[in-house]
From Swiss-Prot:
Belongs to the universal ribosomal protein uS2 family. This is Small ribosomal subunit protein uS2. It comes from Azoarcus sp. (strain BH72). One of its GO terms (molecular function) is structural constituent of ribosome. Keywords: Ribonucleoprotein, Ribosomal protein. The gene is rpsB.
């Protein structure tokens, strides 16, 4: 789904931070200032936003995985909801250091989470003593909170999408170390350095956050449906040929 300039305005994407907190590296994306608040140039945001969405669309069309990241209070729910809609992994609680660079260890925690979930599903937890069951239940809650959003992520993601790159410096650094492309919302108080696909704009307003997250989720779904259409188109021809052949054999 395409996003219009009007929608960006209505969501307050153009409202940056107070001018005294600005990062000079964001100067190319700043239109001016109003009441000591920097105003983002939406014409430039629009171009960058579309570039980012094209990248996400292509990635999804190639069956790639994009990890959604934002642990900010006002972004958590929105981000998790849109990531789930797109069938993508997400981190909405706390970024655990080494989540990417030490994925081997994270994988062990994911394995444990699935084991505990299976215990609850098949009822084997009921065979434990009350005290043991309570310990396991608490462990499950802790694991679900920290890695529940990435439990189906089999390996490292092909890209990460971050709302507020300054707030998630560790995630950005880990992605850079591993050469994982970063799609990031960058406000006027942060540096766009090291962000492969910059979306210059407000990273605090929940309406703006929803616009970005929905856009990325839509791009993922569009990329995926494109693949399905291609498979159906290619498979459709094959299916017709096979069917004709089998009818001839029957006759």
């Amino acid at each position: 789904m395409t996003v219009t300039m009007r929608q960006m305005l209505e969501a307050g994407v153009h409202f940056g931070h107070q001018t005294r907190f600005w990062n000079p590296r964001m100067a190319p994306y700043i239109f001016g200032q109003r009441n000591k608040i920097h105003i983002v140039n939406l014409e430039k945001t629009m171009v960058k936003y579309n570039e980012a969405m094209n990248f996400v669309r292509k990635l999804a069309a190639n069956r790639g995985t994009i990890l959604f990241v934002s642990t900010k209070r006002q972004a958590r729910e929105i981000l998790a909801e849109e990531a789930r809609r797109a069938g993508m992994p997400y981190v909405d609680e706390r970024w655990l250091g080494g989540m990417l660079t030490n994925f081997k260890t994270v994988k062990q925690s994911i394995k444990r989470l699935k084991e505990v979930e299976a215990m609850i599903e098949d009822g084997s937890i009921e065979r434990l003593s009350k005290r043991e069951a309570l310990t396991v239940t608490r462990e499950l809650e802790k694991l679900q909170k920290s890695i529940g959003g990435i439990k189906d992520m089999g390996g490292l993601p092909d890209a990460i999408f971050i709302i507020d790159v300054g707030y998630h410096k560790i995630a950005v650094t880990e992605a850079q170390k591993l050469g994982i492309p970063v799609v990031g919302v960058v406000d006027t108080n942060h540096s766009p350095e090291g962000i492969d696909y910059i979306i210059p704009g407000n990273d605090d307003s929940s309406r703006a956050i929803r616009l970005y997250a929905r856009g990325v989720a839509d791009a993922v779904l569009e990329g995926r449906s494109q693949v399905l259409q291609e498979i159906v188109a290619a498979g459709g021809d094959e299916f017709v040929e096979v069917e004709e052949g089998s009818q001839e054999q029957q006759g």
